Regions:
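Extreme N-terminal starter segment of soluble prokaryotic enzymes
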Residues: 1-4
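Conserved N-terminal subdomain of the carbohydrate kinase-like
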Residues: 11-23, 38-119, 133-138, 294-307
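Histidine-anchored nucleotide/phosphate-binding helix
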Residues: 27-37, 132
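Short beta-strand scaffold segments in enzyme catalytic cores
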Residues: 34, 80-83, 213-217
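Short, conserved phosphate/pyrophosphate- and ester-handling motifs at nucleotide-, phospho-/glycolipid
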Residues: 36, 170, 240
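Conserved post-catalytic alpha-helical subdomain immediately downstream of the catalytic base
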Residues: 43, 228-299, 303
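A short acidic, amphipathic alpha-helical/loop segment
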Residues: 55-56, 127-134, 155-159
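Conserved phosphate/ATP/ADP-binding segment of small-molecule kinases
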Residues: 137-140, 147-224
Length: 307
């Protein structure tokens, strides 16, 4: 199966209490694509600078990621630097240099427009809208956003919500978008702003809660899933996009897209995020084997067996 993904590619400088690195390959496209590539062929659309080396393109191709949709522009690749303390929920952004990403205005290649699964990474909601309008009735559209866009591009974001099937955000962003402190009420409000899917099913909101797992809401039901507990966590960068990669990747292989398959997909998303945080940047996702994913899924599944 094929997945179209649109978002950022970056060079990250990361510092945690346990690991650090400079110019680490990152961005939403990198984490999403590496995670999803274990399930499907990935067709990313993004922009990089002249400092993006042939070895980086080679890495993508090695992992079932088609690099033909990546534009190489004059200038430097988007770069970001962040620091974490022992509470990984508190992150300090040292700098953000958009560079070539500042002028990113994606035009989908003709062959990409009919790809049935679309992931919209964290970016300007107007760009997300433009991308949706270029596609030819995809089977599933999943989007991410953040507090910056909720605050500055609210109208555009609300229009985007009416075109997507699933929104993935964290609890603070849920409250901010809904303008409601109670998380349950906030989730219900956001789902009510979304239109029924092209399949006639309920729109879905997934709320990421880090070490506390996630909540999934449809118009009728809700579902809670814990995180996969790890002894060692070294770097949470990209975990949300790795979750999305596992989630969409699993769904791309399913005959039926419904609440049951969505729930199982959240388990695979959680598994991919758990691998991501075990090493600096995307290192673990790069070396990960399908066998390891299935072994961890079986362990995770046992948590829900009645004793």
């Amino acid at each position: 199966m094929k997945i179209l993904a649109v978002g950022s590619i970056a060079f990250d400088t990361i510092k945690t209490p346990f690991v650090s690195g400079k110019n680490v390959l990152g961005g939403s496209l990198t984490y999403f694509s590496l995670a999803a590539s274990h399930f499907a062929k990935i067709y990313p659309v993004g922009v990089v600078g002249r400092d993006f080396k042939p070895k980086h393109f080679k890495l993508y191709r090695k992992h079932n990621i088609n690099s033909q949709g990546l534009t190489r522009a004059a200038g430097k690749t988007f770069s970001w630097s962040g620091q974490y303390d022992y509470d990984f929920n508190n992150r300090k952004t040292v700098y953000t240099h958009l560079n070539v990403f500042a002028n990113f205005d994606p035009v989908l290649p003709t062959a990409y427009k009919s790809i049935p699964y679309l992931f919209l990474g964290n970016m300007d909601p107007q760009l997300q809208l433009n991308i949706c309008r270029q596609t030819a009735n995809p089977r599933l559209i999943v989007a991410d956003t953040m507090n910056y866009w909720i605050e500055r591009k609210r109208k555009e974001l609300l229009r985007t919500l009416k075109l997507i099937d699933i929104l993935i955000i964290n609890d603070a962003e849920t409250r901010q978008l809904a303008k409601e402190h109670n998380l349950y009420k906030a989730a219900r409000k956001i789902v009510s702003l979304m239109k029924p899917t092209r399949r006639g099913g309920s729109p879905t909101l997934i709320i990421k809660r880090g070490e506390y797992g996630l909540l999934m809401f449809t118009r009728k039901n809700w579902f809670s899933l814990p995180a996969f507990i790890l002894e060692d966590v070294f770097d949470p960068t990209g975990a949300g996009d790795a979750f999305a990669g596992g989630f969409v990747g699993f769904l791309s292989r399913q005959k039926h897209l419904n609440e049951k398959s969505f729930r199982k997909a959240t388990m695979y998303g959680t598994i991919m995020a758990s691998f991501c945080v075990e090493q600096l940047g995307p290192k673990k996702l790069i070396t990960l084997k399908r066998r390891q994913i299935q072994e961890r899924f079986k362990k995770f599944k046992k948590l829900f067996a009645l004793i």
